[in-house]
Regions:
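Alpha-helical assembly-interface signal, strongest on the long, hydrophobic N-terminal helix that forms
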Residues: 1-78
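Long, compositionally biased low-complexity segments
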Residues: 65-480
Length: 480
């Protein structure tokens, strides 16, 4: 009995030792697996850094936008797998990994998600560059424009009131003792019909390169010259202007407009550039030729200035009196109060529009103009309206051509278009260096998966827990 008890005790201790050994082996196996996974992840992350470094160089150098080079996309899976093997060999792999398949998926290119991918990168880049003083300065300028735009309805009400008062005395024909004068609006209208580019640039050379529109939407609208001989036509133009987009959301659009002025060329930019010259003008106008884009931007700048100048001219009693006398003189013996009132207001509006043309000429020459004018800042007289000849009065402190480009960019109705048009410009400019470059092949975000096999730890020739290899699958989302 004693021997049996001793044998049972020995067997029990042996089993206890075996259980203890198994527990130790499981713990060691767990530590081994944990360490191996950490090692594999470190090598995997090193491979990710390598792949992320294969970005499109020209895109990064010219625009500070990062995306995978399309040429690398074709070989990324093989390259990543080879990189993993190389790193394992160089680091003296004690875990005896076996590399499996590499797969890239969930790809987003720079043109994806309706421009949101490009927008995200621009915002990330510009978030520290929208300094407080820039924001404050722009806010002040935009507010001045918005305040005067709001006064446009007041001008329309004043015109209507004057004409109604004149109609009450329409039977009292008023003859003028002065000789009949030539209507300056006729000469002015002739100049307007020539188009905004010759009106502003004169004989200066203007680029007319074509723009290849791939991502953006071509703007097919046309700008016609205002007819200051017809009241209804002018009223229609005033109504259309009131419908233009507001700049209420300018804070949210500020990063992209600052990015645009930093990385894209425009008329008064003094830096030399090959290829497209009026890039920001294209972002605004969306035409397929440089000259058309410049012309459309000129018309829109004239319209912006017109509102401010109209407010100024209607606040000047001397100009109102001069316009009334000129209207009566133009109409001569056929003049009567309603017609004189209409002609007077059309003359005042024509003068404000002519002054706006002079303003844009100053802007196109790289000079500044006052945001809000007074009578002392005024340049054009009724005598010079037909030929637009006057002494210009640019200022040192005021708004520049670039400032008005910012206003036009911010006030775009379809705010996504500026991103698509940026894509067009980026692609066309980079193609001067890389002929087959396509922006929609540049990958901004992707998922990369890697399969590995890990040889399990063995004890005395026995593999625990009874399988030679275990599968490891690693993946990460990569975003530039």
């Amino acid at each position: 009995m004693i021997r049996d008890e001793q044998g049972s005790m020995s067997a029990f201790l042996a089993m206890l030792f075996l259980v203890f050994l198994l527990l130790i082996s499981v713990c060691v196996e767990g530590i081994y697996m944990y360490t191996a996974r950490g090692k594999a992840m470190g090598i995997y992350m090193s491979g990710l850094s390598h792949t992320k470094g294969n970005y499109q160089k020209e895109l990064a150098d010219m625009y500070h936008i990062y995306a995978m080079d399309p040429r690398y996309h074709k070989k990324i899976e093989i390259d990543f797998s080879d990189r993993m093997k190389e790193s394992l060999d160089q680091n003296g792999d004690p875990f005896r990994f076996q590399t499996g398949s590499t797969k890239i998926s969930d790809i987003l290119d720079l043109s994806a998600q309706k421009g949101e991918v490009l927008k995200y990168q621009i915002r990330q880049q510009m978030q520290y560059e929208a300094a407080g003083d820039i924001l404050k300065n722009l806010t002040k300028k935009i507010k001045a424009g918005e305040d005067q735009k709001n006064e446009l309805s007041g001008i329309k009400d004043q015109i209507q009131k004057e004409e109604e008062e004149a109609e009450e005395t329409e039977n009292e024909k008023t003859l003028t003792s002065e000789p009949v004068k030539k209507d300056p609006r006729k000469g002015f209208m002739k100049l307007l019909k020539e188009g905004s580019v010759p009106l502003i640039m004169g004989e200066k050379k203007v680029s007319d390169l074509p723009i290849n529109i791939v991502y953006g939407k071509k703007d097919t609208t046309k700008q016609s010259a205002w007819n200051f001989m017809n009241r209804k036509d002018v009223e229609k133009e005033l109504d259309e202007f009131e419908k233009t987009a507001s700049t209420d959301s300018f804070a949210s659009e500020l990063p992209v407009v600052l990015y645009a002025t930093k990385y894209f060329h425009f008329l008064t930019d003094t830096t030399k550039k090959d290829g497209i010259k009026y890039e920001i003008e294209y972002l605004i106008a969306g035409k397929d030729s440089e000259k058309e884009n410049l012309g459309m931007v000129f018309w829109r700048m004239i319209a912006l200035r017109f509102v401010m100048n109209a407010v100024c001219v209607y606040q000047d009693p001397a100009k109102e009196k001069e316009a009334a006398l000129l209207a009566a003189s133009i109409l001569g013996v056929t003049g009567f109060p309603p017609a004189v009132a209409v002609a007077k207001n059309l003359l005042l509006l024509a003068l404000a529009y002519g002054e706006s043309v002079i303003d844009v000429r100053n802007l196109a020459d790289g000079k500044k103009i006052p945001a809000v004018k007074t009578s002392s800042d005024w340049q054009l007289s009724f005598a010079g309206l037909a030929t637009l000849n006057c002494k210009r009065k640019p200022v040192n402190q005021g708004m520049s051509y670039e400032d008005y480009l910012l206003l036009l960019l911010i006030s775009q109705k379809d705010k996504r278009q500026k991103y698509f048009r940026m894509m067009d410009l980026m692609e066309q400019n980079i193609r001067r260096k890389v002929s087959d470059f396509k922006l929609d092949q540049c990958i901004s975000s992707y998922k990369i998966s890697q399969n590995l096999k890990l040889k399990k730890l063995g004890f005395g020739g026995m593999i625990l827990p009874f399988a030679t290899y275990t599968d490891l699958k690693m993946y990460r989302y990569v975003t530039y």
